[in-house]
Structures are given as C-alpha cells and as structure tokens.
Amino acid sequence: SGTTSYSKGVMLPYRSLWSNTKFAFEVLELEAGDKIVSMLPMAHMYGLAFEFLYEFSVGCHIYFLTRMPSPKIIFQAFEEVKPSLIVAVPLIIEKIIKKSVLPKLETPAMKILLKVPIINDKIKATVREEMIKAFGGNFKAVIVGGAAFNQEVEQFLKMIDFPYTVGYGMTE
C-alpha cells in the first residue's frame, strides 16, 4: 500500500482477491471475448485484481504492454486493441490530459470560445468524443485508482462529462 503515503508491504488474504473479483462481476459488464490492455504492474493488487483476475475469469483477451506505458504507447495499444475496459492509475490519465488536451483548450482563442454557452457545449462534446476515440472508442468503463487523482484533471473530466470511475485501494 502507498496510495497516500510511503509504500509499505501489506499481506492480503485470499478472500480479498475473491471479494474484488466478485465485486467486479457484480458491477462491471465484461463478456467472454472482450479485450483489455494491461498496463499496470501485476505485483500491485490494483493491476492484478482489475486487469487480470477478473478479466481472466470472464474469458477476456488480455493484451500486455511490452514496454513502459508512455501516452504514445498506450494510445497505440488502445487504437489497435480497442479495449472494452480501461484500468489506469491517475498519473497515466493526468499525463494524457495535461500534455495532449489541456494545452489546446488554454489558447487565448479557445478560452474566449469556452465562455460562449452554445459553443462551449459543442467544444466539450467534441473534446469528449476525441478522448473516447483516443481511448479506443469501445470501452464500457474507465476506472482510475491506485493513487490520489489530480483535482484539475478530475474537474476537467467532469466538465466534459467523460465516463470514468475513481476506485480506492483495498489496503488503505
């Protein structure tokens, strides 16, 4: 565990793995044959439980990244695989938004356009659709967890009505 402080080893019983898998069966809607891009370390419970155990038990196809997950590599994988579920840590989502999306919206012209009600809605809808497409365009959910989420990025996702869920670690 180390979501909000220094890392520390935590012993987790079998029932914690089972309860997370059972929870995923109850709330996630994956089916056999759905595709997942696994980018989180399997040595961490978040990645193991929500990018492998649940998907494996459902019968999903799990694609493991063979390199460190940079935004470029992740988007390339999303484009090729078109995952049904995206499980990420906040840092990945934050890098993508801060480097690829926010700079375009912070230009002087865009700041003015975002103040005009009807145009504002169109811009937000366009940004949301572009982000959905960049994430493969096929996902049923984006789950963000394993660390604290940057408030600016979370507010942005809420503003554009991007479909995501924030999870919280079972060892906290």
Predicted stretch roles:
Residues 1-19:
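Conserved AMP-binding A3 loop
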Residues 2-5, 44, 172:
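Active-site proximal helix/loop that lines the substrate pocket
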Residues 4-6, 33-35, 59, 133-140:
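Short, surface-exposed connector motifs at secondary-structure boundaries
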Residues 6-10, 36, 46:
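Transmitter module of two-component histidine kinases
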Residues 11-13, 89, 150:
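GHKL-family ATP-binding catalytic core of two-component histidine kinases
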Residues 18-35, 42-130, 163:
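Conserved AMP-binding/adenylation subdomain of ANL enzymes
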Residues 114-162:
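Short gly/Ser/Thr-rich phosphate-binding loop of adenylate-forming enzymes
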